[in-house]
Amino acid sequence: MTTKIKTLLDYTRDKTNFNSIERYVDYLARYIDYVAGGNVQADIVSAKEPKYHFLQYKADATHNVTRPFNSELFVGKDIFDCQRDDFFRLLKDISIAKEDDELRRTINRMVYSCQQAIGMTLDALPSAENNKAKKLNGDLFEVFIRLLIAEIGVTVKEMTEKVTVRANDQYSFDMNYQHDVMLYKGEELRAIGSVKTSSKDRGDKVFVDKFLYNKLTDLDIPHFAIYLNDVQRAGKAPKFHVNSTFLTAHFMGYTVKLNPLDGVYYCDITHLMQQNDILLKEIHTLDKLFVDDIWKFVGKEPVHSRTRYDD
């Protein structure tokens, strides 16, 4: 039976469907099958950067064109089974990727592809629902990252934290901080993370949050940021291309003059993020967080976290 875009949209719009890593991976498989089944009108190659493609849906999705996806990262039908198996093997013991660049790439590919499959599905919605779709996509990315962190054996929470601000040793007021990711060692908070599909709208905020949070609490808690990518569709049919949403000067200004973050991680790093020594030092692919840095944040060694993926 042929899958309809409406079926995929109905599934993605119900957040309860994405309550496990398996659900994200299963949805990627469904989307790959949908595309491979001849359900898209065109695969459009970016006029300026040919590794970026766009899909144009058929009449049942009013010929909408998707966001750009990196064809070098997005998992195709021909390699899906192998990538899925390696991904679940990594979740059992992330340390096996330490000296294996191909397994590190699998982390980036699978996280990127699972999330892009959701976002590209939501691109089939009418333009009047763009804001709702953007929020849903962002929420599901946050959930996915927290599920992955928990799966590799790190205690992670999401919460609104009340910070009491005192002046001259007297009560002044409370400030609420909404944290996407809080990493713990036992009961001790060890790091705070921001998770967004793009730095476009809130890239500055994470720098300010680190400065204010540590100033107000008299602590020195590491702050890090996770982004899916920083590219968006530009131009008009048939000459679509991509524009960067990464604000180089803003990032460098906050890094140099306010405070650097303790990690910035992307699934899809662009050439703009690699053009000088500061950016090369500060920005990394997502695998570095999961394989290396998260264990430094929480002060322990990687663990063989679960057994449910064992043969």
What feature does the model see in each segment?
Residues 191-192, 219-227, 262-264:
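Hydrophobic beta-strand segments of well-ordered beta-sheets in folded domains
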Residues 209-212, 242:
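Short, solvent-exposed amphipathic alpha-helical segments in soluble enzyme
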Residues 212-220:
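Arginine/glycine-rich "motif VI" loop of SF2 helicases in the C-terminal RecA-like domain
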Residues 3-153:
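Interdomain/boundary linker segments immediately adjacent to catalytic/signaling cores
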Residues 152-174, 184:
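A short acidic/basic microdomain associated with nuclease active sites
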Residues 181-183, 190-197, 206:
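Conserved catalytic cores of phosphodiester-cleaving nucleases, focusing on short active-site segments
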Residues 196-209, 235-237:
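Active-site-adjacent loop/helix micro-motif of nuclease/hydrolase catalytic cores
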Residues 229-311:
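Domain-level recognition of nuclease-like catalytic cores that cleave nucleotide substrates
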